[in-house]
Amino acid sequence: KKEKTKAKKEKESAEGTVKEKKAPSKVSKAARAKKINKQIEGLDLIKNISTQLLKLGLSTIGTVSLKEYKDVVKQLGDYYLPGPQILFQKLIFEIQEYKEDQDTVHYQQALECLKRLRAIEKKGREYLNAELEKENLGISDNTLYEDLGGVWKLEQLNDLGLKKENARLIQLAFEVTYDEASKIFTDYGYWIDIDSGEISYTANY
């Protein structure tokens, strides 16, 4: 009888533990929604700045304007948008280089950055609004999550069904890149799955 009572208590204790683990999900959902809304605010800022840049033209940016845009870059860090933040850093860097040497390559690179920022702002907004409409605000496998600066954890990849165990891989190539604007080194590894022929890459920052 004592053993049954003990077993019952252990079961109740275990169930209580499970319930305690489930409780934070509501907090996580609220935090996720709050973060998404903050990101949308950041996209509003990107829209205003990019529209201004397109209207005035990149070549008209002066020293004072560059300082203002650098302040905007810092602000983007408060909006959970590290992806667009790095892109904006690169845009400013290319403009500075263009003003120094007048090499049109830098100007074209700056334009490409601006185009990407506009695209991320529009598509990112649609993606984030769609995420808010979902009942489950878990991480999705949409690449826009990565474009906005999100980084998938191994546990999240597993939940998304993107984790593969016991895979036999061969490394096809390896390279290290350095982004002068963001001051970030990135190690890239390119792999092929021997069994499926699927090619993928890994990136370490």
Residue ranges and their predicted role:
Residues 146, 152-184:
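Structural detector for short beta-strands of small beta-barrel domains
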